[in-house]
Amino acid sequence: MGLFLYLLFMIVVGAFIGGMTNSLAIKMLFRPYRPIYIAGKRLPFTPGLIPKRREELAEQLGRMVVEHLLTAEGLRRKLNDPSFVQDMTSYVQEEVEKWLQSDRTVEQWLKQFGMPDPKQTAETWIETKYKTFMSQYRQRPLHEIIPIDVLHKIDHAIPSIVDRLLLRLRTYIESEQGERQIEHMINEFLQSRGMFGNMLQMFLGNVSLAEKIRPEIVKFLQSEGAKQLLVQLFINEWEKVKEMRIHEVEQIIDQEKIVVWVKRLTASIVQEPLQKPLGALVAPYVRHSLPTLVRFLLQFASERIERWMKQLHLQDIVREEVASFSVERLEEMILTISRREFKMITYLGALLGGIIGLIQGCITFFVQM
């Protein structure tokens, strides 16, 4: 009975010492948080290991994250992974679809992004561009401003324009309205000539002068000479127009009228799209091009991920974040992860201490015999 109690006592003492030693060693990883001084001398093992090595720990964690955990190659593999590309495409499509279903108009979206009056902004922009254009080209002739191909098209279009004009004139003159108009003009002309006009009307009697003149006018309009005359007239006038300087055109039309006309044109063009839901305007194009756009962006990111990571200085970010943690927070984080393992270490120390106590008790007992 005495031997059993003696050995039990040695086991308990050994287990207590072993458990307390390991528990104290674990606590000394974190505590004390700050160095302790007595008579101006720092006590050994103060502060604890982690508070003492916090800067070094932060540096090593930052290096470990960049070199072994969050590497450019690992991110590149993830970005190029077909399943990840498909997941990202599906996610973006879902989010964009929500946006496309929105009833918010283009004007509302523009206002949200800092454009309080899109219509006025467009008008102001057009007016500014007009004034800038005029300040640069006011002294230059039209033929230097209008594109060459447009000038050539107008040059070649003059004969066809003349043909259409002559056709319209012949059609009008051959109509009843044209006949009445010619007769009215002849009567006004004869009346303006006084006695000579009256004598001419008496000489003609009941014969209508308009009926005699109208066929000759039609005949003239059908002649090649009339066409060549008008073509040459149009060409001469067009050459004069091409030589006109921009400021001359501006004076003829009036600058203010041009600006007002441009603003009205802008308003008529811009107003309708501004009142439509943005989703309805862009939905067909977005849905069609979205998968290609997602793949392009992921490929773009994959090719530049290493450069971006260097520019982000991830190692410094991790180091600064860890260094900014209080020792209490570091202790809490590590214990949250490893509390069970630390307990097992304490229990292991108690177990080893108990075994050592048992062995020591047995040796002592046999030595004393």
UniProtKB/Swiss-Prot annotation:
Similarity comment: Belongs to the UPF0754 family.
Natural source organism: Anoxybacillus flavithermus (strain DSM 21510 / WK1)
Entry's Gene Ontology cellular component terms: plasma membrane
Cellular location(s): Cell membrane
Major site of localization recorded for this protein: membrane
Keyword terms, alphabetized: Cell membrane, Membrane, Transmembrane, Transmembrane helix
Protein name stated in the entry: UPF0754 membrane protein Aflv_2299
The UniProt record lists the keyword Ribosomal protein: no
